């Protein structure tokens, strides 16, 4: 029996790893162990419940206003005992979080093979996104299995000198998750509030956007909403108190913008599927929305997902207020521009990434 341990801590990681947990649990020759760090406790629990995943270990590192130093040292100090107790054959981590980096580092110290899900994404600017770009590059040095979501991600890894025999193009597990969560008969009170209007979904939380960039983003969104009475915007706000303070000060009193608590993954994916367009600084939404045929304006200066830009499903608009305003306004007023983005092809997979990863691990772990 092969022991495969999956470690994750944030909501976006959980959305992409829980389908893989459930796929691995169907394999008779694999013992699946789940460890969560609890970095975003409330938001993480929502996803675990939606996918009916019960962690075997919980490091419970969550505390208010913790720094990267706190997160790094807490995970490193606590994951060691779990790894030594479980003695897994392979540890799977996802993407670019601090949990991913620190877990991979601990595995390196203990000489445990690491499988990197969503490997090979790059901006090649270690401060954008921060600290994610450094995290994922560092994990690629350590990883024995590199599960790249696209051919471009594979090419990035090859350019960096990774052994081709360790790289597998699987598609993105985010697309697998949508098969479970999006439902035709879904209803929600906030969707009833937006009924009859074009629904705009907003997400914004990135560390590098805190402060003035986020203020610019929210001012642009408010201007457009105030000028277009036929739209309503919903913003499931992040738990970060700094984000909440900025959002409340700029968007809080606008009758066409509803700030709500974080949605669980089932709710969130169904909100996305019923939206007209999406403004975000998230990484995962850049993959999920194109699968649903929704245009995405990416409020970041860089993206590690250029496939979506190239395909035309995403547009990188940065954090400048006027640029966001003009692009948001165009998609509301220019039907051809909207149609071009909403009908572009999805470059992120077919919904069978988890099966491919499990097949590889079953044969090679």
Predicted region positions:
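Nucleotide-activated sugar donor-binding and catalytic core shared by glycosyltransferases
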Residues: 1-235, 240-365
């Amino acid at each position: 029996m092969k022991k495969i341990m999956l470690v994750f801590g944030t909501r976006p990681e959980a959305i992409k790893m829980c389908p893989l947990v459930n796929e691995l649990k169907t394999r008779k020759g694999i013992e699946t162990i789940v460890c969560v760090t609890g970095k975003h406790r409330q938001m993480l629990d929502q996803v675990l419940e939606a996918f009916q995943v019960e962690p075997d270990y919980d490091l419970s590192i969550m505390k208010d206003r913790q720094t990267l130093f706190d997160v790094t040292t807490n995970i490193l100090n606590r994951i060691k005992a779990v790894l030594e107790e479980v003695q897994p054959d392979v540890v799977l981590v996802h993407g670019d979080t601090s949990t991913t980096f620190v877990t991979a580092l601990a595995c390196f110290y203990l000489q445990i093979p690491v499988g990197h899900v969503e490997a090979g994404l790059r901006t090649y600017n270690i401060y954008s996104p921060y600290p994610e770009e450094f995290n994922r590059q560092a994990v690629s040095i350590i990883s024995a299995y590199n599960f790249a979501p696209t051919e471009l991600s594979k090419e990035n890894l090859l350019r960096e000198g990774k052994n081709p025999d360790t790289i597998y193009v699987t598609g993105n597990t985010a697309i697998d998750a949508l098969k479970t969560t999006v439902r035709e008969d879904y209803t929600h009170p906030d969707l009833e509030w937006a009924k009859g209007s074009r629904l705009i979904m907003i997400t914004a939380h990135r560390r590098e956007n805190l402060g003035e960039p986020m203020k610019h983003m929210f001012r642009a969104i408010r201007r457009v909403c105030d000028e277009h009475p036929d739209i309503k915007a919903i913003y499931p706000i992040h738990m970060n108190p700094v984000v909440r303070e900025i959002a409340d000060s700029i968007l809080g009193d606008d009758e066409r913008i509803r700030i709500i608590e974080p949605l669980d993954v089932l709710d969130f994916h169904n909100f996305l599927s019923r939206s007209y367009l999406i403004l975000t600084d998230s990484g995962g939404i850049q993959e999920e929305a194109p699968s649903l045929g929704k245009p995405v304006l990416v409020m970041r200066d860089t993206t590690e997902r250029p496939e979506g830009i190239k395909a035309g499903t995403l547009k990188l608009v940065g954090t400048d207020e006027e640029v966001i305003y003009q692009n948001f306004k165009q998609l509301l007023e220019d039907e051809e521009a909207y149609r071009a983005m909403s009908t572009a092809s999805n470059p992120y997979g077919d919904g069978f990434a988890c099966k491919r990863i499990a097949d590889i691990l079953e044969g090679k772990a």
